[in-house]
């Protein structure tokens, strides 16, 4: 696997989890900086789901032709060993929405 970059979306194995943490293998947005991604064995991710409550901290994106929500209330650090196949990269406008929500 090459260098993981901010804004890319990967399949990530989130199990095992506890309590209300989001489960299963699902798409996740990489939110950690490229500098961190180059040197650390972990990355910061925000899971993506096609379901879920429409909260302000859950910007909408399109993934595989379907609307999906980026769960900024479920941000977590994961080891790169949890990463699966790269799905793609989000648009710059969606990335701006993510940043605005994280800073709000």
Regions found by a protein language model. Give the residues of each.
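Conserved functional hotspots at enzyme active or ligand-binding sites that engage polyanionic ligands
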Residues: 1-104
């Amino acid at each position: 696997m090459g260098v993981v970059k901010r804004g890319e979306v990967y399949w990530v194995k989130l199990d095992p989890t506890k309590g209300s943490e989001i489960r299963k293998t699902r798409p996740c947005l990489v939110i950690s900086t490229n500098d961190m991604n180059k040197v650390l064995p972990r990355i910061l991710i925000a899971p993506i789901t096609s379901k879920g409550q429409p909260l302000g901290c859950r910007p909408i994106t399109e993934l595989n032709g379907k609307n999906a929500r980026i769960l900024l209330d479920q941000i977590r650090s994961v080891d790169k060993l949890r990463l699966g196949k790269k799905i793609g990269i989000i648009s710059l406008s969606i990335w701006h929405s993510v940043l605005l929500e994280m800073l709000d």
